Amino acid sequence: MDKKIKILTLGDHPLSASGIGTQTKYIIEGMLKTGKYSFFCLGGAMKHEKYDLVKFEEWGDDWQIQPIDGYGSQEILRSVMRGHKPDIIWFMTDPRFWGWLWHIENEIRALAPMVYYHVWDNFPAPTFNKKFYESNDFIATISKVTDKAVKAVSPSVASQYIPHVVDENIFKKYPDQEAAEFKSSGVIKEGNFVDKDGKQKFVFFWNNRNARRKQSGSVIFWFKEFLDRVGHDKASLIMHTDVKDPHGQDLEAIIASLGIMNGEVMFSTNKYPPETLAKLYNLADCTINVADAEGFGLATFESLACETPIIVTMTGGLQEQVTDGEEWFGIGLEPSSKAIIGSQEIPWIYEDRVAGKEVVDAMEAMYRMTQEEREELGKKGRNHVITNYNREEIMKKWDEVFTKLYNDLGSWENRKNYKAWEFKEIA
C-alpha cells in the first residue's frame, strides 16, 4: 500500500487511564505496528495541563494527539477534516455524547466513512437509537449484548462484534514473592493484611468509578454483613476509586457509620499505571463487580487475565466474562429484579439488581473455597481471556475492518457508496 490509511479518532485521550482511553491506545498501537496506518487523535474527556500537540518518537507523524476539552465540536471537527483529510473517522463511547456529530453526518460522511465503536448495556432493544445507528457506515460492538441490540434495531447497518482486549503481558500472574513484596510496599497505606492469628486475610478488590450504577455503597454494606459472618479480622476490601466522586456516595462516611475503620475497607485513590494495577489484582483473592448495568467491565476482565477469579452480576458484558457457556471463572449472580428505568435521552433500559444476601453468600462461597480451587478458577479465567479475547486476533479484525472500509467506501475524491440525500415520493 503506497498511501497510509489516515484515521481520525474522537473520544477519551488515548493516554488516559479510562477504559475508553486504554482501548483506543491498544487499537492505535496494534494498527501502527502493521505499517499501514497513521492516526490523528482528538483526545478529550480529561483535564489537560497543556494543549500542545503530542507526538511519539517511535511513531513520528504517524501518531499525533491534539488535547481538547470535552469530546470536541462541529467547528473543531470541520477544521480537522480540512486540515488533515482523514480517510476514516473512528469514535467511541456512549451515544449521548455524539449527537452533535451525527447531526452533521451527511456533511462528514460525504468525505469519509464513520466507524462507531459502540457499547449498550441492556435490552429492551433501544429503538430510539435507530437514527444514531443509521448515521454510521460501520458499528463495532464491544459485547454480545450490544451486538444483539444493534442488529435488532438497525439490521441494515454493517456491524460486527469486536470485544475489548487486555495487555496480557502486563495483566498476568506475578510470582508469589513479588505479590508479597507489593503488599508491604505502602501502595495501600492502611494495608493490614494479617488477622489476629497471624494468617493472611482474604482480600476482595473492587475497581470501579464511585457512581450509582456501580453499587459502591451497597458493596460496603454487604461486605460488612459478610464480615459479621466470618469475623471482622478475616478479610479486607480494597476499593480503587474516588471516595468523594460527586456522582457517587461518601464512602468514608459509610465505613465510619458501620464502624469498619480498622483496615476492613481500604481505599486506593491514586491513579496508577497498568503495571501497578496488575499487582493490585494479584494481591487480591477475588475481584467483585455487582453493578446493575455494565457495558463490558474492564476491571474484572483484567482480573481474569491476572488469574484472580471474579464475582459479577449477570448483566451486559460481565456475563460473557464469568463463563464461556460451559466453564465458570468465578461466580455469576442472576439479577433478583429487573426494573425499567430511563431519562429524557434514554426512555427505557433494564436495570439489573442483585439481592444483597446473594452477594454476601457469593463472598462467603469464594472465601470458603480452598486456595487450590480459586487458583484453578483463575487459571481457567486467564485461558478464557487469551483464547476468546486474543489481542492479536482482535487487532487482525480491526485491520480487516479498516482496510475493507478504505477499499470499498473510499474517502474524499474517491468516496463511494454513500449518498447525503434520499429521494422520497410525496403523495
Question: What do the predicted segments below correspond to?
Answer:
Residues 78-98, 113-115:
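Short N-terminal targeting/anchoring amphipathic segment
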Residues 1-55, 84, 424-427:
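N-terminal subdomain of nucleotide-sugar transferases
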Residues 292:
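Aromatic "clamp/platform" in nucleotide-sugar-dependent glycosyltransferases that forms part
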